[in-house]
Amino acid sequence: MKFLLSTLAATICFATATSAFASGADPLVTIQKKWAVCQYESKDTDNQIYCLENLIKRNEEALKQEPNRQELKVWLAINKSSLAGADGGLGALSLVKEAKVLLEQVIDKAPETLNGSAFTSLGSLYYKVPGWPIGFGDDEMAEKMLRKALEINPDGIDPNYFYADFLAQDGRKKEAIQYLTKAQKAPPRADRPLADQGRKQEIAKLLGELQ
């Protein structure tokens, strides 16, 4: 049960990201909001790649300024994984390996960062990346990470959605529907309305395929 790396695709609008960083806004908030723009309002793959490459650079710059800020590490991992999905090609596996290292560092130092988002992100990599000998994909590790994410954030939209997606790909339809239904009822994130809207569309799509 391995997905092509293209399923990890996401994008960002670099022009607006640049102005947001320049304005003195919290880089974490900017990254989160612009990621939602990339993921759900992207116009084409080339734009995804260009914008995400530049966002990664700015994420790295922000992390240099605050090297102990684990939230920025989580999002750097998410952005690298997203670029791997958007670009594919020979560099994709290197990007997801870099993302894996970042997420493992967060889990080791501050596992509850962003409500356990490192577990959710690492779990999704484990079931989407090809397994040995190509990559590090591992369904058992995927389920372990995703269930840990749910222990930390049992009502969150993302951990419930990604665990449901994993279950669906594993052929566990009934369980997947249960977690998708729970994801639909997740409390809204006041600072991330676009991300919530886009995720709910993905939830509805997967539910439609399973029912």
Feature-to-residue mapping (PLM):
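N-terminal leader/linker segments that initiate helical-solenoid repeat arrays
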Residues: 17-58
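Short coil turns that delineate tetratricopeptide repeat
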Residues: 67, 111-113, 154
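Helix-turn-helix repeat elements of alpha-solenoid scaffolds
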Residues: 44-60, 92-101, 135-143, 179
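Bacterial N-terminal signal peptides
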Residues: 6-16
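Conserved structural position within tetratricopeptide repeats
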Residues: 57-64, 107-108, 147-151, 185
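Short coil/turn linking the two alpha-helices of tandem helical-hairpin repeats
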Residues: 31, 36-45, 82-91, 114, ...
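TPR alpha-solenoid repeat register
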Residues: 72, 115-118, 159, 193
